[in-house]
Structure formats: C-alpha cells, structure tokens
Amino acid sequence: MLLALAQWLQNDFGFLRVFNYLTFRAVMASLTALVIGLGFGPWVIRRLTELKVGQAVRSYGPQTHLVKAGTPTMGGVLVLIGIAVSTLLWCDWGNRFIWIVLLVTLGYGTIGWVDDYRKVVHRDPKGMSSREKFFWQTVIGLFAAAYLAFSVSETSNMRVLELFLDWVRSGLSLSLPAKSHLIVPFFKELSYPLGVFGFIVLTYLVIVGSSNAVNLTDGLDGLVIMPVVLVGSALGIFAYVMGSAVYSKYLLFPHIPGAGELLIFCSAMAGAGLAFLWFNAHPAQVFMGDVGALALGGALGTVAVIVRQEIVLFIMGGVFVAETISVMLQVTWFKFTKRRYGEGRRLFRMAPLHHHFELSGWKETQVVVRFWIITMMLVLIGLSTLKLR
C-alpha cells in the first residue's frame, strides 16, 4: 500500500524513491511488525487473561509444567496480526506470491484458531478432531499446490492461466518448465523434473508437513518461535536471490520473477516473531497456540516451495523434522510392541523429543537454547548452499 502511494508521489517528492528498494521495505516491514507486537502484546495478553483463555497442562507430562496451567494461549493471533498488517503496508499489492502465502498463513491460522477456541472456550480437550483438521489443511494445501504448480515459472496470472490451458489441451501430459524442477542443494545443475502431479504432491506434503511439524515443536517457552524466525529469515534471503535476475544468474539458480517480494513477508514474520518472543520467553506470559504454530509452519512451507528450496527447508528445519520423527517413531513402536508383547513400549521417555530431554534431566531453558543453537547451525548450512554448489 505504501509502495503504491510512494510511487504516485515520488515525482513531487524524490526521497520517496527509496520505497522502490526491496531491502528498505524489508527492514521497515520487520520493524513495523516488531512495534505492533511489542505495542499491542500487553493488551492482547490482558484480554486473553480476562477471557480466561488459559492453557491446559497434561498431568502425565513433565511435572515442571504444572505451574503453567492457566497461562493465556492463542497468542499466535498477535503474530499473525503483525505479519498481515506489516506485509500489506510494505509489499507490492500486485505480487501474486504475497497473496498466496498470506492465504495459506491466515487459512492455517483460522484452522488453529478454531481448534484452540474449542479447547479453551468450550473446554473440549480434543478441540478439532484430527480428521477435521487434516481435511481443512488438505483443502488449503492442495489449492495452494495446484496454483503454484503453474505459477512458479510464470510472470503473471494470465501466463499461469495460459500454461494451465496448455496442460489441459495436452491431455495432462505437458511438462512444467525447468524453473519448477526440484533443486538438489550442493550441486550446480542437478535438479529433478516433477511434472504437474509430482509438483502438487510434493508441495502439499511440504506445506502440510511443515505446518504440523512446527505445531509439534511448540511445547516449551520460546522453543518454536526462534527457529521459525531463523528459518524464515534465511528463506527471505533465498527469495531475494531467486527474485533477482542478477544474483540468481550469478549463483546459478533459476530466476523466479516476483519471488523477491517474499522478503517483505519473511521480514515481517521475523519482526512479529521476535516481538512474540519478548512475551513468550521463559517464564512465558502467553503461549502461541495452534493458531500461531499451524500458520507459521504453513508459511515456511509455502515460501520454500515458491523459491524451490524444499530440501533446504528440510535441512534448516532439522529441529522440526526431528520432533516430528520422534512422535512417529514413538507411536509406531508403541503400537508394534503392544501388538507383539501385549503392552506398549516406548523408544523415548516422552514425545515430542523436547519432552524426552526434559525427563532426562535437562532444564527447560537448556532444551530451548540448545535447540536454538542447533537451528542456527542448520540455517548456516542451508545458507551455504547458495555458494557451495
């Protein structure tokens, strides 16, 4: 919005040309989201407290968590407001990638909000059923995947429509352009063609998987938000590179026109995330809830798909991956041993993984900071793929 206003007035006020610089708008988007979060955070926490939107704590979990009972949850609303307002203020409204990322983020946030609302307001400990939640995640994920399959390699929605019609006329056999291939990190020119259906399936798995992985990681004060900020910031750098004809050519990446604008979104996400961490740091004054975790995970997955860095997201989000795998292994092993031996056995003291370390004697703050450090290292490895190819 501010970009359009500045471009309209820049002939009379030359200093407004600074708005044309993507890096300037990215910095301002981050600061705007940070100010919104810090400014409205206390009010949001008070309102959540007054509404008695308190977190329920499982009695069979770590005993140190019992003191957290009643802490306001659904604080992810604050993050989403910061992201949405800041992005819309500083982005180019004509950029199609911004809108699809916002759609996924707010759509998944809505799913999380309904789930949280049922849990804390209706006092339903189950919230949305797994089937219902998965259905709506699938609807949004498949819609985004289908659009991006034809959008990533094109420069406008008209070209997207033309590519889709060409695909239909070809009997659904038309191959997607090379820009839509799966990029393999650390190799200069190694990529795999996916085809339309392959692209849609991969995109769906990345978006839904990332959303649920971030949600599983959100279990300790400050644990999930810093990795989200770090990974999101790194994806913003990839977006800037892929959106630049100069940098993408120099670094041997496909040029994706319009992808650079996602730096605005990622910067807003970083600013909003840091503001939330101010209140979520141990001892937390507010919890994110599914409304924030599902949305942020979906956002990371969508951005990664657009900038063709699905594998790099898997690397940088290693903490999210480990948490998810720990749950899958725990459930699978428990069911297998129960069927074979008559009683279920556990691989971990408790899943997700952060609870295993807690029950192994690590303090909560140790788990959190050590997971942050691991994420920092993984993000640096991910960023190294820009040049080490």
From Swiss-Prot:
Swiss-Prot/TrEMBL catalytic activity: UDP-N-acetyl-alpha-D-muramoyl-L-alanyl-gamma-D-glutamyl-meso-2,6-diaminopimeloyl-D-alanyl-D-alanine + di-trans,octa-cis-undecaprenyl phosphate = di-trans,octa-cis-undecaprenyl diphospho-N-acetyl-alpha-D-muramoyl-L-alanyl-D-glutamyl-meso-2,6-diaminopimeloyl-D-alanyl-D-alanine + UMP
Residues annotated as transmembrane: 25-45, 74-94, 97-117, 134-154, 190-210, 222-242, 259-279, 286-306, 311-331, 366-386
Pfam families membership: Glycos_transf_4 (PF00953), MraY_sig1 (PF10555)
Subcellular location: Cell inner membrane
Function per UniProt: Catalyzes the initial step of the lipid cycle reactions in the biosynthesis of the cell wall peptidoglycan: transfers peptidoglycan precursor phospho-MurNAc-pentapeptide from UDP-MurNAc-pentapeptide onto the lipid carrier undecaprenyl phosphate, yielding undecaprenyl-pyrophosphoryl-MurNAc-pentapeptide, known as lipid I.
Family the entry assigns: Belongs to the glycosyltransferase 4 family. MraY subfamily.
NCBIfam families registered for this protein in UniProt: mraY (TIGR00445)
PANTHER family: PHOSPHO-N-ACETYLMURAMOYL-PENTAPEPTIDE-TRANSFERASE, PHOSPHO-N-ACETYLMURAMOYL-PENTAPEPTIDE-TRANSFERASE HOMOLOG
Name of this chain's protein: Phospho-N-acetylmuramoyl-pentapeptide-transferase
Gene this chain is encoded by: mraY
